[in-house]
Amino acid sequence: MRLLKPLVALPTYCLVLFIRGYQKWISPLLGPHCRFNPTCSSYAIQAINLHGSVKGSWLAVKRILKCHPLHSGGNDPVPEKLTHINHQHEK
């Protein structure tokens, strides 16, 4: 079981490393143009770290698709991670 944890974390680590590379080498060449706060790349890192590589990547893709001139942008934080709560019905 101890060996599985690093393997499960590997996709998350690789995705974050890729995004950090984009932030360091590509984004400065493009200039600041993201209409959202946090930026799309920061949002992607936060989403992947909070929700995991699959759901976090899906949230990041949805965010990037919203980043266009017809969308007003603004503050758009990563959604909180939902927890399952068992509700008991009172009698």
Swiss-Prot record:
Chief subcellular location: membrane
GO cellular component, one term: plasma membrane
Coiled coil segments of this chain: none
Localization (cell): Cell inner membrane
Extent of Basic and acidic residues compositional bias: 78-91
Keyword terms: Cell inner membrane, Cell membrane, Membrane
Domain of life: Bacteria
InterPro entries hit by this protein: Membr_insert_effic_factor_YidD (IPR002696)
Record bears the keyword Cell inner membrane: yes
Disordered: annotated segments: 72-91
Membrane topology: Peripheral membrane protein
Pfam family, one: YidD
Similarity annotation: Belongs to the UPF0161 family.
Function: Could be involved in insertion of integral membrane proteins into the membrane.
UniProt xrefs under NCBIfam families: membrane protein insertion efficiency factor YidD
Protein name per Swiss-Prot or TrEMBL: Putative membrane protein insertion efficiency factor
Organism: Pseudoalteromonas translucida (strain TAC 125)
